[in-house]
Regions:
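Glycine/charged-rich beta-loop-alpha catalytic/anionic-binding loops adjacent to active sites
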Residues: 1-5, 48-58, 106-110
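Alpha-helical scaffold segments in soluble metabolic enzymes
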Residues: 18-22, 36, 40-43, 71, ...
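Short alpha-helical "patches" and their helix-cap loops
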Residues: 6, 30-39, 83-95
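Conserved phosphate/anionic-ligand binding catalytic regions in large, soluble enzymes, centered on
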Residues: 3-19, 63-68
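Amphipathic, alpha-helical segments enriched in basic
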Residues: 16, 40, 44-47, 51, ...
Length: 119
């Protein structure tokens, strides 16, 4: 039986692997390079999960999609041969663009998907 890994969550599970696959296919990267990207992404997700939250139900889409996008950015820089400092810069630039999204709840847990809340 295969396992499905939601990285970082089920609601954002297509962001990171989709971005990684697109880059890997475009640049014809080998499997070990892609694995290194996934390892870098797992470290990024681990830091966020231990210091903040990754659940959209708690932190809104900034937490869920933001973490996934940061994981993707870091993974791609790693796959392209970037330094750890460059990976960090990619994460920071990605997160800066996702902070303060207006769709997130001001004081609490969301009760429905963004489309329903903003619809």
């Amino acid at each position: 039986m295969f396992r499905i890994v939601a990285c970082p969550t089920a609601g954002s599970c297509g962001v990171m692997p989709g971005a990684v696959k697109a880059v890997a296919d475009h640049y014809q990267l080998d499997k070990s390079t892609v694995v290194k990207g996934f390892l870098a992404a797992s470290g990024i997700g681990n830091v966020v999960a231990n210091r903040a939250c990754v659940a959209g139900a708690v932190g809104g889409c900034q937490a869920e999609i933001g973490t996934a996008a940061c994981m993707a950015a870091g993974a791609i820089v790693e796959m392209m041969g970037g330094t750890p400092r460059q990976v960090g810069h990619a994460i920071a630039l990605c997160m800066k663009n996702l902070l303060g999204l207006a769709c997130d709840p001001v004081a609490g847990v969301d009760e429905g998907a963004c489309g329903k809340r903003n619809g």
